[in-house]
Amino acid sequence: EICACLVGSEMCIRDSVRLVKTAEQMEAAAKLFAEGRRSICAGGWVQEALDALTPEMFLPQLQQEKQEGWVCYLHYTKDVPDATVSVHHKTGQVEHLFVTESARGRGIGQKMLDFARKKLPEHEHPVLTVLNTNTRALALYRRMGWQVVGAKEKFDPAKDPLVVRPSQVLEMRYQG
């Protein structure tokens, strides 16, 4: 657990990053995952598709990923989970970095990405994926030394009735 005390206008806020171990923590991660995915996909997919992005949809995925070697972490502010990130030690991947809308703009995303990268010391150049329309995340990743190395999945309204705006998943690699 990482703790820090941030002092501003006589108020001390405790924040920490914790390994997801319990069912309650896994459910909190699934809730953040769903909120993050809906936020990122808003404007790019039809409402029906966004409505399907629920914690109940992502909980089995996170549980399966845990079985496959993924490790998930939650960030807490005042004991309330407000961000999540997952890492895979064998492959050097970082995924599922989501910060709640109410917690954005406080450096939590940067802290979580740095935390995740440092959890992979055996991988000099870890990788992550990001939707190209997620410009805020792309800007953060670039500032932190990540570079686009390719495109993966593409979403095309002409080929998928759930998609309303073209986008693609970019792969980024940490270059330092």
Map each language-model feature to its residues:
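Conserved glycine-rich acetyl-CoA-binding loop
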Residues: 96-114, 131-139, 143-144
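Conserved acetyl-CoA-binding loop of GNAT-fold acetyltransferases
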Residues: 142-152
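Conserved acyl-CoA
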Residues: 111-126, 147
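Single conserved hydrophobic/aromatic residue that forms the stacking wall/gate
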Residues: 1-15
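Conserved beta-strand-loop-alpha-helix junction that forms the acyl-donor binding cleft
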Residues: 104, 127-138, 154-159, 163-167
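Short hydrophobic/aromatic beta-strand or adjacent loop that forms the aromatic wall/cage
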Residues: 70, 165-171
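Acetyl-CoA-dependent GNAT
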Residues: 20-26, 31-102, 113-115, 119, ...
